[in-house]
């Protein structure tokens, strides 16, 4: 079969089961694709030999009718997840030589279900960024190009390597992480599907911490059905994670292609007045609303009065937690160690952290340390926690009236890779639409729903009430099916 890399996961699972091709064929095709498009820089570490060994095992299991749910499916794993015996760097010089002695739970669930890791996906250092320009291992390039020029575009961040790999057919799915939009925003920029479950649905065990009250594993695929397949595998209680929820895992795949007539979708119309949103994004939003109306969905106007405070709240809280979490990288226990002339402990701390962390990570640590200082904690950290509760209440009140909420995933289409690099506030605004749901711990999905004038993909976001991943799959699947658009980068 030609074009194995362009199959969906559900198609590939069916093809493997019917002996139309082998797992070795499928993995080899993806390795060849990785070789062909290495300039995209999607991977930090590639493991083709190990992947082919795993493919042989999958072929044996398939041959003996012992196939697991995603037997033989090639995946990318964000380099934030610990992988036993395989380099795990968090895209930082600080961890450039770190090899874990255990596997992250989310990763092991995928492997135990038959998934085959092709390599570790590039990302913003310690998951801090929205353009994948903060990696010690170089920028990731979006496979998409604007129709008007050949300028390299950002794939989004922090899971930019993950989204680029899936968009460029270098993986059928990618395990990512989402703290303030790091799965959904890259999906929006690359014409892929990115889903973040409710906080606590997927174990954080073995995922290098950025902001513990916000971090959550997520997944990037090319279809809603594939996202449902992968997320269902990843979800479930884990006693090793104190924030893990002991809740029943729903049959997410069954939500695909379900009728949506009679469902209620909330629209915060005030958000359309936000000057950060491009006219193309607002047009896509309005078109999606009309599409849902045509399918019998009731559109309800809702108010989210505190949503405009989400961005500053997020950067105070996430930076505060990051300054605490990253204190462990001191050059003594593990990670980069730099010794000076005197080699006293304070000098080792200072030199190791100065050389090991990149500029954006240092900026976040400084912001967090400032917010937690005894003179500032009441004005910044405590106040941010209080406003976070108001944002949660906004969503709770809205979900008393609607099943899901519909807003865009990003304020614009993908932008040039080298623009705004020296303007952190402008870069932070890229997450303005994804952060609110993260602060509330809600499940949300980004699906490609239109194109810009320059033929770049635009993403639409469906937000569900807590633990209601089922309905966001249901709505997004209906939108995907009704649009029936192909999101394939030019030349692929």
Swiss-Prot record:
It comes from the Bacteria. Pfam families: Amidase. The active site is at residues 78, 158, 182. Its EC number is 6.3.5.7. GO terms for molecular function: ATP binding; glutaminyl-tRNA synthase (glutamine-hydrolyzing) activity. The keyword Nucleotide-binding applies. It catalyses: L-glutamyl-tRNA(Gln) + L-glutamine + ATP + H2O = L-glutaminyl-tRNA(Gln) + L-glutamate + ADP + phosphate + H(+). One of its GO terms (biological process) is translation. Signal peptide: none annotated. It is an enzyme of class 6 (ligase). InterPro entries: Amidase (IPR000120), Amidase_CS (IPR020556), Amidase_dom (IPR023631), AS_sf (IPR036928), GatA (IPR004412). One of its GO terms (cellular component) is glutamyl-tRNA(Gln) amidotransferase complex. Belongs to the amidase family. GatA subfamily. HAMAP family: GatA. Allows the formation of correctly charged Gln-tRNA(Gln) through the transamidation of misacylated Glu-tRNA(Gln) in organisms which lack glutaminyl-tRNA synthetase. The reaction takes place in the presence of glutamine and ATP through an activated gamma-phospho-Glu-tRNA(Gln). This is Glutamyl-tRNA(Gln) amidotransferase subunit A. It comes from Orientia tsutsugamushi (strain Boryong). The gene is gatA.
């Amino acid at each position: 079969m030609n074009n194995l890399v362009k199959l969906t996961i559900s198609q590939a699972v069916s093809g493997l089961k019917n002996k139309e091709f082998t797992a070795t064929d499928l993995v080899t095709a993806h390795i060849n694709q990785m070789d062909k498009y290495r300039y995209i820089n999607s991977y930090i570490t590639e493991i083709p030999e190990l992947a082919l060994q795993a493919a042989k095992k999958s072929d044996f299991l398939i041959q003996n009718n012992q196939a697991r749910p995603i037997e033989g499916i090639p995946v990318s794993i964000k380099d934030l997840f610990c992988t036993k015996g395989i380099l795990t760097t968090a895209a930082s010089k600080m961890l450039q030589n770190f090899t874990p002695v255990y596997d992250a739970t989310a990763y092991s669930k995928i492997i135990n279900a038959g998934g085959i890791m092709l390599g570790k996906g590039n990302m913003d250092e310690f998951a801090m960024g929205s353009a994948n320009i903060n990696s010690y291992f170089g920028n990731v390039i979006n496979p998409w190009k604007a129709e008007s020029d050949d300028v390299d575009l950002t794939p989004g961040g922090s899971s930019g390597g993950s989204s680029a790999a899936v968009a460029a057919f270098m993986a059928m799915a990618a395990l990512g992480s989402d703290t303030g939009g790091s799965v959904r925003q890259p999906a929006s920029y690359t014409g892929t599907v990115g889903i973040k479950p409710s906080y606590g649905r997927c174990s954080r065990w073995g995922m290098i911490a950025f902001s513990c009250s916000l971090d959550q594993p997520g997944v990037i695929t090319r279809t809603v059905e594939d996202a449902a397949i992968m997320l269902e595998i990843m979800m479930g209680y884990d006693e090793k994670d104190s924030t893990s929820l002991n809740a029943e895992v729903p049959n997410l795949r069954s939500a695909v292609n379900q009728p949506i007539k009679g469902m209620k979708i909330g629209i915060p119309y005030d958000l359309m007045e936000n000057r950060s949103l491009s006219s193309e994004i607002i047009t896509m939003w309005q078109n999606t609303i009309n599409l849902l109306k045509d399918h019998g969905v009731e559109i309800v106007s809702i108010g989210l009065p505190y949503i405009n405070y989400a961005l500053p709240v997020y950067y105070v809280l996430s930076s505060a937690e990051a300054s605490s979490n990253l204190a462990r990288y001191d050059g003594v226990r593990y990670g980069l160690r730099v010794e000076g002339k005197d080699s006293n402990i304070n000098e080792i701390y200072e030199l190791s952290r100065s050389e090991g962390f990149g500029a954006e990570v240092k900026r976040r640590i400084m912001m967090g340390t400032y917010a937690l200082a005894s003179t500032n904690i009441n004005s910044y950290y405590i106040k941010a926690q209080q406003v976070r509760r108001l944002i949660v209440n906004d969503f709770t009140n809205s979900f008393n009236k609607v099943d899901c909420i519909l807003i865009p995933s990003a304020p614009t289409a993908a932008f040039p890779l080298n623009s705004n690099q020296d303007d952190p506030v402008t870069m932070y605004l890229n997450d303005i639409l994804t952060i609110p749901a993260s602060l509330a711990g809600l499940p949300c999905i980004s699906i490609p729903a239109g194109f810009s004038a320059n033929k770049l993909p635009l993403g639409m976001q469906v937000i569900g009430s807590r633990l209601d991943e089922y309905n966001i799959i249901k709505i997004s699947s209906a939108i995907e099916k009704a649009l029936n658009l192909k999101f394939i980068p030019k030349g692929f």
